[in-house]
Curated annotation (Swiss-Prot):
Tetramer of two alpha and two beta subunits. PROSITE patterns: AA_TRNA_LIGASE_II_GLYAB. Pfam families: DALR_1, tRNA_synt_2f. It is found in: Cytoplasm. The lineage of its organism: Bacteria, Pseudomonadati, Aquificota, Aquificia, Aquificales. Keywords: Aminoacyl-tRNA synthetase, ATP-binding, Cytoplasm, Ligase, Nucleotide-binding, Protein biosynthesis. This is Glycine--tRNA ligase beta subunit. SUPFAM superfamilies: HD-domain/PDEase-like. InterPro entries: DALR_anticod-bd, Gly-tRNA-synth_bsu, Gly-tRNA-synth_heterodimer. GO terms for biological process: arginyl-tRNA aminoacylation; glycyl-tRNA aminoacylation. It comes from the Bacteria.
Length: 664
């Protein structure tokens, strides 16, 4: 079990975003063959490295059963082999002595049982290595040889493979593995030999490559901390920038630069976005205001020339941004609204102007629920997409919403209206905040509801991992808003705006799957129980009911409630629809008592299924003393309807038939 394997796939510079996902995929795929106890990955822009230790590599013996024809086909009435059996033996190069008669579900069959020696895990890897590399799910793949078959995210230039200190022969196209790697593109010359996996990190560091992602990240974070102290502020940069920059360099060198204070006229988020978007620079702030400093991370040893180059390129970007900003401020946002008729939302859905028309109808339905000021909401709806026509957003589309807020505020629009223009895109993820203002909440919901309805009606439905229009994000955004804001919203109310369309059931199922994902921390049976009763189009009811049912499930009394509910459910025909109970037909005392108790509970506002526990006594008494399936059809149907009413009471909280009670 002391076997160890090191594989390094050397490439041209990989996009930062593909490195970690590719390593995760390769790790899982290769370790499914090796089953190693220790696994470690390393990744830089020029290499994907995997290390496996402590795995078995024996060739294992196993029995292989080759099934033949049924016994009565293989032998005649006298027990002699038939032509069918002879053909089976010839095909498998076997003798009559090897034949066994074994039982299957459909009777007795002849079979040949042989001992087979399986390939070792390493042999399997050698056999499957090329296919594994070809199966890595990159967003885009490229070819660099005459072979149309060999593709990867970027050209593969070398493969290092060591198994227990010896070169392991692996192939990818015409490329063969060796014990050679390469150091830093600029700071190291020629091949680097690795003879022992234990020397891998140390040797690469000597050649200006830090293969460990976390170590490079820590160097960048320390550089940010040191630079913050130097400039007297703290770092200010978009989420994910540290991780992205970490995968852009093999050896991080910090470069602290400065820009002209005149650019601080720009809104802070514009500066940090320009710096991060174009150059992957980090900015700094103090007391909520940006400082005119930035930190760049170079993949080469820093000098004054590199610093000046960084400052020059950022200055050019900020100069452009300042020009766009000043030009945009000259245009009243309202004057841009008619221009939205020329901005296509989607060929099958219409223009942005048409989208705002639909959003206004949605907002009108939402307004009473949130007690909004309609004039504010209406103004926000019609201003919501105009910043798409500004020069700043054309250049940096990630600033949409924010620039609407900035320009609206600068032009004297109502503060809540201005803020709503930014909040319409909240939350951008499940971790992101929801809108604070009422107007922003309505605008955000209107935008996301329209996205779902419009694209599903157009047949533009997410498939697999593909979601080009961010519909999963829209759905999660709606779910989180109604959850955080406690909005008892029925999304089906907006269907009339879009009319009938055949994809509507797919929209309902789509929301159901998003709710299941949102509620993944809760037991599956409880989530399923609620979704069997409440429509996914009522996300607040679903979420609230799951939480109520889950809290109740912690009680020692909960199994008794479930038992009572299931006892009722089991006896009711699945297609039973009648809830009407004729009191005159209740001839037994136990059924009269159950009916009386039932009506008491039906008139209560129940907050927990545990409140139904007292009903169990009457349910048990009913089943012990009353014959449900009475010979008289009217009496029988009346009793079933009574039980249907009882079941319906339990269904206030979910379908108890789905609840699994764990013993002990």
């Amino acid at each position: 079990m002391t076997n160890e394997l090191l594989i390094e796939i050397g490439t041209e510079e990989l996009p930062a975003g593909v490195i970690n996902p590719a390593l995760d995929y390769l790790k899982d795929k290769i370790n499914s063959l090796l089953n190693a106890r220790q696994v470690k990955t390393y990744g830089t822009p020029r290499r994907l490295t995997l290390y496996f230790k402590d795995f078995e590599n024996e060739r294992k013996e196993k029995k292989e059963v080759i099934w033949g024809p049924p016994k009565n086909v293989a032998y005649d009435e006298k027990g002699n082999p038939t032509k069918a059996l002879e053909g089976f033996l010839k095909k498998n190069n076997a003798s009559l002595e090897e034949v066994k008669v074994l039982k299957k579900d459909k009777g007795e069959y002849v079979a040949i049982v042989r001992k087979v020696i399986e390939k070792s895990p390493i042999e399997k890897l050698q056999e499957e290595f090329e296919e594994i590399l070809l199966s890595v799910p990159f967003p885009k793949r490229m070819r660099w040889t005459s072979s149309k078959r060999i593709t990867f995210s970027r050209p593969v230039r070398w493969i290092l493979a060591l198994f227990n200190g010896q070169v392991l022969k692996l192939r990818f196209g015409e490329l063969e593995s060796s014990n050679k790697t390469y150091g830093h593109r600029f700071l190291s010359k020629g091949e680097v030999t690795i003879n022992n996996p234990a020397d891998y990190e140390k040797t690469l560091k000597e050649h200006y490559v830090i293969p460990d992602f976390n170590e490079r990240k820590e160097i960048i974070l320390r550089a940010l901390e040191k630079s913050s102290q130097e400039v007297g502020g703290k770092p200010s940069y978009p989420e994910g920038l540290v991780e992205e920059v970490t995968n852009l360099v093999e050896y991080p060198f910090p470069v602290l630069g400065k820009f002209d204070e005149k650019y601080l006229e720009l809104p802070p988020l514009v500066i940090t976005t320009v710096a991060a978007h174009h150059q992957r620079f980090f900015c700094f702030e103090k007391d909520g205001k940006l400082l005119n400093y930035f930190l760049g991370i170079s993949n080469n040893k820093p000098n004054e020339k590199i610093k000046e180059g960084y400052e020059k390129v950022l200055r050019a970007r900020l100069e452009d941004a300042l020009f766009f900003y000043r030009e945009d401020l000259k245009k009243d946002l309202k004057s841009l609204i008619p221009e939205l008729k020329k901005v296509l939302f989607h060929p099958k859905v219409g223009s942005m102007y048409e989208k705002e028309e639909r959003m206004e109808k949605i907002a009108q339905k939402l307004c009473p629920l949130l007690k909004c000021e309609w004039e504010k909401v209406k103004e926000a709806v019609w201003l919501s997409k105009v910043d798409l026509l500004t020069e700043m957003v054309k250049e940096l589309d990630e600033l949409q919403g924010y620039m609407g807020y900035v320009y609206a505020k600068a032009q004297g629009y109502d503060e809540e209206v201005a803020k709503a223009l930014w909040e319409q895109y909240f939350p951008r993820s499940l971790e992101d905040k929801v809108p604070e203002t009422t107007t922003g909440t309505i605008l955000s919901l209107s935008d996301k509801i329209d996205n779902l309805y419009s694209f599903f009606k157009a047949g533009e439905i997410p498939k697999g991992s593909s979601d080009p229009y961010g519909l999963r994000r829209s759905a999660f955004g709606i779910i989180k808003i109604v959850d955080v804001k406690n909005l008892d919203l029925n999304l089906e109310d907006f269907k009339e705006i879009y009319g009938e369309f055949k994809q509507y059931p797919k929209l309902v199922e789509f929301l159901k799957q998003r709710l299941i994902s949102y509620l993944e921390d809760y037991p599956v049976d409880i989530v399923r129980a609620v979704l069997n009763v409440y429509s996914p189009m009522e996300p607040y009811k679903v979420i609230n009911s799951v939480r109520v049912l889950y809290e109740a499930s912690k009680s020692p009394e909960f199994p008794s409630v479930v038992e009572a509910a299931k006892r009722v459910i089991r006896i009711i025909p699945k297609d039973w629809k009648n809830y009407e109970v004729d009191e005159k037909l209740l001839s037994e005392e136990a059924e009269r008592e159950l009916y009386q108790k039932l009506t008491e509970f039906e008139n209560k506002e129940l907050k927990s299924p545990l409140e139904l526990l007292p009903l169990k006594e009457y349910i048990d008494k009913f089943f012990d003393n009353v014959k449900v399936m009475a010979e008289d059809e009217k009496i029988r149907n009346n009793r079933i309807s009574l039980l249907k009413r009882v079941e319906n009471l339990f269904r206030t909280f979910g379908d108890f038939n789905e609840i699994v009670i764990k013993e002990g």
